[in-house]
Amino acid sequence: MYRIPTLLTVLILLLGASPLRAAPFCDPPVLTAVAIEERTPGFTVDAEYPVLCRAEPSRVIRDFVSNTIFDFKKVDPGHDLSVFPHPYELLTRYAVWPTAEGRFVSVKLHVMAYTGGAHPNNWPMTWVFDMADGGEITLNRLFPDREAALDRVSALCRKVLSASLGGMLVPDMLDAGVRPVEDNFKRFILTGEGVAFFFAPYQVAPYAAGEQVVTIPFDHLGGLIAPNIAAAVRAE
């Protein structure tokens, strides 16, 4: 007697031993972008930021941009060009790096603010979000042994920047900017190559050198990255 295979049996035969892929955490990681434009005789605001596919990270980014705009407007609310003949400006632009399977999404916001002086101030703001729970991957969450990790990261960044800055190298500035303390390395993202650390103008070199970034490959940080994060990154 022959039995008609059930649908489940057919699927098992077709799939064989192939591993089942987990469903993506959310897709696409960026749903849309928000643009804020305001112009008065004394001010220009031109801000953009992403809306991610989870509500928690989107609120964090939105609140940061809103507070930055609020603080910018407080600098000189009555500015009308009568004393200083140039408008004040605030600009933000963003970039997003999802990891291959979407577990982690990194966001970098470039902020430029001009409120007088010889040139604008520029600085990076970064976040790494775990799309499994919407939480932020802080430096402490990335590196359980923060002291050992900062010592390693500091030494590697010093080596790279000492070579790449060339004529812009100012040893005292570099020494201060890469000291193994949390504030010097809190602006980072996760990429396919490793952990990228961003340094604002003046942190490690003169303003003319611009923003600096050092990407440290994951294998150079072996044993220092939190096991659950390292496992997820390796799996991707």
Language model: regions and residue ranges:
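Compositionally biased intrinsically disordered regions enriched in Thr/Gly
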Residues: 20-236
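N-terminal secretory signal peptides that target proteins for export/translocation
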Residues: 1-2
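Bacterial N-terminal signal peptides
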Residues: 5-16
